[in-house]
């Protein structure tokens, strides 16, 4: 009985020792990127790369009100803002513009690999010459860069198109 009592006391002390040790918690690494435009396929105009406003790195992070300098959210992760290109509603995006914007975005995402999570700021109503599912294509290319271990989350307009390819990635 005395032996069991000593074992229980020893185990309790050991357990308290482990639980009282404060280990520095590793923050998740989260990237930010995106392409956002609402296209009208009825418009005769096209949207080229010059139609997009680009925000990168800290300017991108500062552009979101929920990431204000004094925001608690800003301290909950290691943020790696890459690039978001956004345009006002316009005509279909030229294939050249899409390929260029996508390449620049992916190149910036590669700079800080690996990520635990990735926030993609997309609209969901982009049309690109020669592509049936531009957001799905973009997400697939992003997934090819960040891998399948990274959680990808998107925000999009309420009427955005969620294709199977987009949802799968």
Model-derived features: where do they sit?
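Bacterial Sec-dependent signal peptides at the C-terminal "C-region" and cleavage site
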Residues: 12-26
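N-terminal amphipathic/basic leader segments beginning at the initiator methionine
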Residues: 25-72
